[in-house]
């Protein structure tokens, strides 16, 4: 019979074994940060974009890891656990959106950003593509990135702090500072190369975790019969069309529209060594995404049977993965699985920090110092980039210090904000010669405004009619497309160089 002292001793030993795995994981990230510092931080393009020298496999997994964040490991399983298989519509929409993104956006963006003044940020590309001499478009799009990504980043820090709090019973603020320190370290010193390599490493960890947990859970339950048990508990658990209205399904599916305008994802396409490597990246990236998301769905479904079988009181569905990893695995393996959650969180934070830093440096500081200074004072601009990483992180930490801050309610809508304001603009910029600066600015701003208005005033009316509960990216995207097209048609046409560049981009992309 175990005494209280013996049980406590075993718990402490288990925690220390888990801590060892987390410490090893952190150490690897620090080493990668040093490697990135030595290899590719000599100029701003190297620091912010890896010198456009990234291979297809790192591109694929870094895009996936920075995209999924802690949502794939905690949010999606929790949603499936709560609502059943109908929550899978978001995975279908995201996978389809990412797949189309590789075909429609990736090749042209890689070629066009280099052709258009070797742009290293999305606002810089918009400026060069539309000959925005007044920098209005660059400043507005840069501000959108800085504001929304600072909020996005703070949500990642909150997730990191809460992970240490819920998994180990440690102080929330200690976990917050620890996660922030590691991410800031390798991003500050190693730049884009370090972020991409760590994302690759973290993507591998995430994939292993999402395959391992549901398989072991089924082995400890009823094998493949676990899904029969889940259906027996509630028939709608395994029905893709039950539990959600048509509006709900369309809303989840429409998340895929956001991919074309997410700066931290499409910057991966800009950094790949050649557009000819993108098919390899696409095959690996979409395979990784499909397996990872299916694994997350499987975690949620097996969790429906797992929780009552092990007599667990699950207060927060989003902690399902944490609970399963602690109950089913040895503490060392459990530490690895908790590292997978950290990997998901930190890969997104680092990508968002770097994109925000690059916008502050390239889109704002360069305006103050001038183009010539940027060419002749590369070391200065790299240092400004590093300091921008630090500054954004400090602001995000300050916001995250109070995890109950109402700003948290806004962060979940950032995907829609970027999707509605940037996705149509990116597509028009890559394909339509008639796009004008006025059309671009009007479309971008109108898309963002519709998202904000929909969230603030329309969605609260969902109890009157479910159409008002439609995901805000849909009306925002539609309005942005219409406004961009109409205003462009009514304003002065761009110069002949645009058609020449578009044709050149098209021809280069078609080269085998």
From Swiss-Prot:
- List the subcellular locations: Cell membrane
Membrane topology according to the record: Multi-pass membrane protein
Q: Name the Pfam families on file.
A: SSF
Task: Enumerate the UniProt keywords alphabetically.
Answer: Amino-acid transport, Cell membrane, Ion transport, Membrane, Sodium, Sodium transport, Symport, Transmembrane, Transmembrane helix, Transport
**What InterPro entries has UniProt attached to this entry?**
Na/Glc_symporter_sf (IPR038377), Na/Pro_symporter (IPR011851), Na/solute_symporter (IPR001734), Sodium:Solute_Symporter (IPR050277)
Q: Which reaction does it catalyse?
A: L-proline(in) + Na(+)(in) = L-proline(out) + Na(+)(out)
Tell me the GO BP annotations in alphabetical order. proline transport
Where does the sequence pass through the membrane? 16-36, 54-74, 85-105, 139-159, 174-194, 200-220, 240-260, 286-306, 327-347, 381-401, 410-430, 438-458, 467-487
Main location class: membrane
GO MF assignments = L-proline transmembrane transporter activity; proline:sodium symporter activity; sodium ion binding
Q: Name one GO cellular component term.
A: plasma membrane
Q: Which family does it belong to?
A: Belongs to the sodium:solute symporter (SSF) (TC 2.A.21) family.
User: Mind telling me which NCBIfam families this protein's record contains?
Assistant: Na_Pro_sym, sss
This chain's function reads:
Catalyzes the sodium-dependent uptake of extracellular L-proline. Since most S.aureus strains are L-proline auxotrophs, this transporter may aid the bacterial persistence during an infection of tissues with low proline concentrations.
Q: What is this protein called?
A: Sodium/proline symporter
Source organism of the structure: Staphylococcus aureus (strain MRSA252)
């Amino acid at each position: 019979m175990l005494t209280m002292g013996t049980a406590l001793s075993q718990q402490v030993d288990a925690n220390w074994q888990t801590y060892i795995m987390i410490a090893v994981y952190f150490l690897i990230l620090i080493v990668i940060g040093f490697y990135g510092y030595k290899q590719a931080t000599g100029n701003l393009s190297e620091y912010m974009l890896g010198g456009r020298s990234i291979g297809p496999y790192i591109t694929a997994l870094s895009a996936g890891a920075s995209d999924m964040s802690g949502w794939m490991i905690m949010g999606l399983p929790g949603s499936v656990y709560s609502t059943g298989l109908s929550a899978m519509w978001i995975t279908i929409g995201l996978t389809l959106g990412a797949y189309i993104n590789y075909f429609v956006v990736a090749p042209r963006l890689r070629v066009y950003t280099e052709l258009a003044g070797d742009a290293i940020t999305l606002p810089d590309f918009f400026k060069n593509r539309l000959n925005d001499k007044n920098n209005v478009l660059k400043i507005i799009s840069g501000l959108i990135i800085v504001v929304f990504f600072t909020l996005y980043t703070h949500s990642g820090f909150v997730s990191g702090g809460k992970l240490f709090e819920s998994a180990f019973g440690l102080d929330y603020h200690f976990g917050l500072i620890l996660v922030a320190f590691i991410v800031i370290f390798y991003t500050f010193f190693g730049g884009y190369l370090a972020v991409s390599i760590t994302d690759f490493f973290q993507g591998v960890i995430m994939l292993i975790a999402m395959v391992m947990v549901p398989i072991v859970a089924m082995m400890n339950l009823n094998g493949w019969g676990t899904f029969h048990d889940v259906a027996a508990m509630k028939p709608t658990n395994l029905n893709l069309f039950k539990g959600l209205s048509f509006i709900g399904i369309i809303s989840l599916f429409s998340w895929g529209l956001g991919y074309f305008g997410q700066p931290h994802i499409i910057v991966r396409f800009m950094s790949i060594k050649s557009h000819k490597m993108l098919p390899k990246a696409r095959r690996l990236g979409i395979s990784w995404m499909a397996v990872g998301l299916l694994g997350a769905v499987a975690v949620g479904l097996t969790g429906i049977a797992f929780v009552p079988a092990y007599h667990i009181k699950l207060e927060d569905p989003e902690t399902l993965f944490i609970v399963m990893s602690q109950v089913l695995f040895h503490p060392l393996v459990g530490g690895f699985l908790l590292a997978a959650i950290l990997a998901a969180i930190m890969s997104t934070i680092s990508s968002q920090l770097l994109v925000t830093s690059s916008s502050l440096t390239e889109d704002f500081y360069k305006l103050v110092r001038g183009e010539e200074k940027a060419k002749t004072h590369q070391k200065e601009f790299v240092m400004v980039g590093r300091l921008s990483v630090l500054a954004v992180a400090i602001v995000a930490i300050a916001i995250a210090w109070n995890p109950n801050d109402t700003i948290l309610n806004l962060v979940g809508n950032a995907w829609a904000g970027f999707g509605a304001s940037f996705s149509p603009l990116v597509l028009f910029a890559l394909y339509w010669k008639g796009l004008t600066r006025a059309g671009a600015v009007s479309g971008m701003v109108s898309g963002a405004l519709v998202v904000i208005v929909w969230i603030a005033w329309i969605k609260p009316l969902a109890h009157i009619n479910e159409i008002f509960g439609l995901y805000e990216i849909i009306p925002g995207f539609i309005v942005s497309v219409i406004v961009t097209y109409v205003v462009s048609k009514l304003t002065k046409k761009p110069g002949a160089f645009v058609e020449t560049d578009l044709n050149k981009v098209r021809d280069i992309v078609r080269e085998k």
